[in-house]
Curated annotation (Swiss-Prot), chain A:
Stated name of the protein: ER lumen protein-retaining receptor 1-B
Residues annotated as transmembrane: 5-24, 33-52, 59-79, 93-110, 117-135, 150-168, 179-199
Record membrane topology: Multi-pass membrane protein
Membrane topology, Cytoplasmic segments: 25-32, 80-92, 136-149, 200-212
Single GO MF annotation: KDEL sequence binding
One annotated GO biological process: protein transport
Function noted in UniProt: Receptor for the C-terminal sequence motif K-D-E-L that is present on endoplasmic reticulum resident proteins and that mediates their recycling from the Golgi back to the endoplasmic reticulum.
Amino acid sequence: MNIFRFLGDISHLSAIIILLLKIWKSRSCAGISGKSQLLFAIVFTTRYLDLFTNFISFYNTSMKVVYVASSYATVWMIYSKFKATYDGNHDTFRVEFLIVPTAILSFLVNHDFTPLEILWTFSIYLESVAILPQLFMVSKTGEAETITSHYLFALGIYRTLYLFNWIWRYQFEEFFDLIAIVAGLVQTVLYCDFFYLYITKVLKGKKLSLPA
Amino acid sequence: EANTAAKDEL
């Protein structure tokens, strides 16, 4: 464990908590892409299948449980509890264009052709593009609530910090995982446009508005 | 040979 990975996990956890609280407190999932949350639930499910078979540490196991539980709770709130507030007309990104290519790629490019490894690889590839429906929805509605932009910022920063974690691990542990690194780079690049808007607008107290 | 380091990561 290193400071970058720890801060990254904290950032990821806070993004998940921010979103849960936003929906629960406001009893509304307006502006939130249910499709992205569905993709995140798939990412965590396919990545943490070794949750019960491969104990790494109490921290690792408890974080995985929190991630899986909160992602399902978020999907449940969007598609069931508060589905009246779900803005389906603007959440129209074709997720099959994300799931199919990443699934095929995980069969072609992986470290080991075994079910667990292919599912792990699929979850890494899918996570790198899972935010696209949400970013697409924000660009379609032309703006996002401030709390949603904080959620997106925390979510984007988490994988950016993981990039530094991988530099650290390459330097000091002679370890690197090209699949995770390349996917993490793609994931971070997808946020660049949003990071720019967040830093130039939201941090100045303005509302986040994208040129529609 | 890329070590699959990322398995102990979240």
